[in-house]
């Protein structure tokens, strides 16, 4: 991709900046501790830059909006042919709007929904998450119009606009308004109603909302995006310069201050134009080693932050931010949904060479106000297990059958076990393949979740 604003500053200005402001990059290499700190402080921004760019700019992404200020709207349920996103699910369908707020505010009109769970989540490059609307707060019973803007939106500073129900300030010029809708696929009539409502979501600029043409958007070249490792070992500092120029930082926030300090050390500061001659030349092999270490730690620690992830600015700790950025950007905070990894009774990894059963009595069911689901993935790519039945999860949305006592037995098996309802069977292909079983609890009773014991998958003995 064409480099962003290369060699912009003329030599005399560069000299002035070097002498007058001390902004030249340090000549020495970063210590291991300094490099690790830089990677940790940057991870959330790299992850969200890749995520948002993938939504808005990558036409091959199955969730692509094909540009900014547009919306991806699903037309049906997801199946195992979707491989571009890890951890897919049909519990909630994704309605993704990508926002460019530089020139003017953007208005999104949301219809009412006939659903137990609908949650609107917003995030910008900093990966702090807000929930402006949710059925957990009584929203989506009637149509709602939300106006989005940032601190740099031209000609607008948050004043009321006739016809707008809520004004919401984003923490950056580029962001996403991510709607999750439980489709209630087990009820054809309700499912059809919710799919119709999804198609009614409307995105327009404030000018368009007021009956005028949209203001022309200034052209902008985005640095290369891809996987997190690709960015860290590629155009890392160019991406970070772009990101900090389009992000609102709070001088009173400790994480913001620490991130800016780490970036300043390598020549990246808000308001500057990227100049490869004035940033630290990082050793890619050292960066790769550091990123792998940070990512591995984040993945290993994910379950430690079930109640501390995907929160607004000021409510996040660095380790929780890294864990959420590594495992899956723009997830739900604990008051909306909690994701639990299901282990085995013998402590061994689940494998498709064997069958398993997960048992829960009525009193052992997850404490969900809305609903819960158990979804099966392969353990390597975290994708659906292909099967002719297109059965990937058990729960109210995908189908479940409780026993007479109100409990449930969920079987993971290559063949449907005798006497087991099809609703409670998760098919696998008999081979040496790691499995991943994930429980999602929507609108959880959080205090009960803190003491609730997750079930274990028990290996079924061969007859």
Which residues fall in each region the model found?
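Bacterial N-terminal signal peptides that target proteins for export
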Residues: 1-12
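Residues at the start of alpha-helices and the adjacent loop-to-helix junctions
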Residues: 3, 19, 31-34
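Bacterial N-terminal signal peptides
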Residues: 11-20
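A compositional/structural signature for long, glycine/proline-rich flexible linkers
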Residues: 26-463
